[in-house]
Amino acid sequence: MIMKIVTSHEMAEIDKLTIDYYGIPSTVLMERAALSIVKHVLKFNPENLIILAGPGNNGGDGIACGRILKNKVKNIKIFQLFPEEKLSEDCKLQLSVAKKFGIPIVVGYPDNDQIDKADLIIDAIFGTGLKREIEGKVAEFIEILNSFKKLTVAVDIPSGVSSDTGEILGAAIKANLTVTFGLPKRGHLLYPGKDYTGELFIEDIGFPEELTNNENLKISLIEREFALSLMPPRPKYSHKTRYGHVFVIAGSTGKTGAAMMTAKAALRAGSGLVTMAVPAALKVVFQSKVLEEMILPLPCTMNTLSKQALPEIMDFVKEKANSIAFGPGVGVNEDIEIILRELILNSSCPIVIDADGLTVLSKILNVLKDAHSEIVLTPHPGELSRLINIPVKDIEKQRIDIAQKVAQELNVIIVLKGVPTVIAEPQGRVYLNTTGNPGMATGGSGDVLTGIIASLIGQGLSPLYASVFGVYIHGLSGDIASRRKGFHGLIAGDIIETLPEAFIELTDEIDSEP
């Protein structure tokens, strides 16, 4: 089953329907939540435990944890940070039960000495429903608590992290691990919230599958089982033409490497054939570099392909190509604009557009409404900013919503690169990637991704699933490369060279499971 990702509103609706329609009492859900937290807390064998309880049901979860842990942990103290009249009904109930169990409860905040002596802290102050900025004494306390760097387990989401955007609402607790319920929330996966979440554990506490896997939940997580299900098959009885012919239109004076990386990545991702359309003036340069790739020298200006190359390009597309990778290092001028326009209007196969191609596209964006084939755009936030005239900082704050909106408005697949990479399609579905690392922030990494996605389209995946699987395997390859090279020394060529191992690791991990 594909793991969905939800907003605070969507999770609240799931919670409400579980209670009101399916008839599972809220106290039962709270008990299950507490048991799941306790399971993780006991891994650390704490002796001195502090529970920070807020006014809502998140606080109730924390108090229930204290009751369950009473005979399992030497010293437990619950700090109820808010007066009883401000507590939710379920939180009041848990507080009443905890008192009857004889658990020490303090209304107020722990002092520095108490924090210092604790070997584990449960953060149950605020949950996913928090919308306002944390201010005043609570904010001051959180800053003090963070300075102690104590082992901290967050209930549902670290207090102060927006569950919808990952933004910090004034102040936030920095957790070592977070135990969330039912489904992950956006704020767990978007920065800076991801940094505050620590290791994320998603626990099933009894929400009906009809709710957690509902088709109206449009955002999904790309995990390895899902990725494996998308991997193109490789039958024993087959031929190179079965695995597609990628047409790479890329490269110009000073940027031949971009074209080479795109082509090489397409081959490493499994393409049967790859041909590069290159400026004839650079023919010797490309011939000195290629082995498995083929080149098609075409008419050119002083530095780039010329509009005179268009007839040969369109003939090749019509007769041989299964997918097109357009843009890496191709240059930016009127001739390239004419070529791209013609491809969008008349190409018989899908086009993946990146880098210089996106810069050119920003000048002719309205042509997308008449596109003849499916289009995949792979911008980083700066490139998307040029396309849609929205500041980069706003794109970073609303990665999911903006990618989703642009995909729908332009009728294209958007691969918004970054952390996390977001894939969105015109019908509103969105996928968040789970692989990749900071070492991949290096020149050429995007060219590699373009080649991979174009390759997967040529092998028969839909442009959407080619993008989803391509982003995952690209990140996994980068993760393998970083184990050997580290983050600082990793280059785009390393990602290409470890692609075969990424495919092996993905399949072996699944095959080795019991």
From Swiss-Prot:
Per UniProt, ADP binds at 417-421, 437-446
Q: Where is the signal peptide?
A: none
Q: Where is the YjeF N-terminal domain?
A: 11-213
Q: Where is this region: NADPHX 1?
A: 57-61, 127-133
Kindly state which keywords UniProt assigns to this record, in alphabetical order: ATP-binding, Isomerase, Lyase, Metal-binding, Multifunctional enzyme, NAD, NADP, Nucleotide-binding, Potassium
Q: Which residues bind (6S)-NADPHX 2?
A: 329, 447
Residue ranges of the region described as NADPHX 2 = 380-386
Q: What is its EC number?
A: 4.2.1.136, 5.1.99.6
- The residues that the entry says bind (6S)-NADPHX 1 are 156
Residues that, per the record, bind K(+): 58, 123, 159
Task: Name the InterPro entries for this protein.
Answer: Carbohydrate_kinase_pred_CS, CARKD, Nnr, Ribokinase-like, YjeF_N_dom, YjeF_N_dom_sf
Q: What does this protein do?
A: Bifunctional enzyme that catalyzes the epimerization of the S- and R-forms of NAD(P)HX and the dehydration of the S-form of NAD(P)HX at the expense of ADP, which is converted to AMP. This allows the repair of both epimers of NAD(P)HX, a damaged form of NAD(P)H that is a result of enzymatic or heat-dependent hydration.
Protein name per the record: Bifunctional NAD(P)H-hydrate repair enzyme Nnr
Q: Which organism is it from?
A: Thermodesulfovibrio yellowstonii (strain ATCC 51303 / DSM 11347 / YP87)
Q: Encoded by which gene?
A: nnr
